């Protein structure tokens, strides 16, 4: 028991340094192995206790049997007029009856302890089966909880508004690049005067496009909310 407590304290101290339920499958498998080891030891103890109980029972039965023989011998000796021989047989009978009583008491005690051990073993085996039945479900629940926690942490790190604003900024930049490219192409066919002539109109159209783009952005954000 002392060694087991030391081991449990050591295991507990190690687990405190680990992430909580970092690997539930490993922990549950270890728990199952520990229970199986305890059950194996309990079975060995039961075998030994059964042997002890059997030995006491055998000694009790042998002593009682010999005591019975000595009683018969004493009666025969007494009937034959051999009183001293009868006394000797009776003395041995009394001694054997005392030993038989001792062995019987030891047998009953050992047998009672054996029954308790068998009851404890049955309880352990029931618990082990219960753990095995629930193990996979517990592992699945732990994995699901861990995955959900990981996803929540990931989502917390992402600023969705910031990401969306970055998307709009890139979109506007691409639009400006397209406009500059188209403007440059048309400039090759026109003159500087023509560019100045339509500059205000072009700027007005650009402003309309920007306004429309912002309206679309606001509508999209409102729909997402």
Swiss-Prot record:
It holds the Pfam family PspA_IM30. Induction: Induced, via the two-component regulatory system LiaS/LiaR, by antibiotics (vancomycin, bacitracin, nisin and ramoplanin), cationic antimicrobial peptides (human LL-37 and porcine PG-1), Triton X-100 and severe secretion stress. Residues 58-151, 161-182 form a coiled coil. The keyword Coiled coil applies. InterPro entries: PspA_VIPP1. Keywords: Coiled coil. NCBIfam families: StressProtLiaH (NF045984). Belongs to the PspA/Vipp/IM30 family. This is Protein LiaH. It comes from Bacillus subtilis (strain 168).
């Amino acid at each position: 028991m002392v060694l087991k407590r030391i081991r449990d304290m050591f295991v507990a101290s190690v687990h405190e340094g680990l992430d909580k339920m970092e690997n539930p499958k490993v922990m549950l498998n270890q728990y199952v192995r520990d229970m199986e080891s305890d059950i194996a030891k309990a079975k060995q103890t039961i075998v030994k206790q059964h042997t002890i109980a059997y030995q006491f029972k055998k000694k009790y039965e042998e002593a009682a049997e010999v005591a019975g023989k000595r009683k018969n011998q004493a009666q025969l000796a007494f009937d034959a007029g051999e009183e001293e021989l009868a006394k000797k047989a009776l003395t041995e009978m009394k001694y054997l009856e005392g030993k038989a009583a001792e062995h019987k008491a030891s047998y009953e005690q050992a047998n009672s302890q054996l029954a308790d051990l068998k009851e404890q073993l049955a309880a352990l085996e029931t618990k082990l089966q219960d753990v095995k039945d629930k193990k996979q479900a517990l592992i699945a629940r732990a994995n699901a909880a861990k995955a959900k926690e990981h996803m929540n942490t990931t989502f917390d790190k992402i600023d969705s508004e910031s990401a969306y604003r970055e998307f709009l900024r890139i979109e506007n930049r691409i639009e400006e690049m397209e406009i500059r490219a188209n403007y440059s192409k048309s400039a090759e066919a026109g003159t500087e005067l023509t560019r100045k002539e339509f500059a205000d109109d072009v700027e007005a159209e650009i402003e309309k496009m920007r306004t429309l783009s912002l309206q679309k952005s606001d509508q999209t954000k409102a729909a997402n909310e």
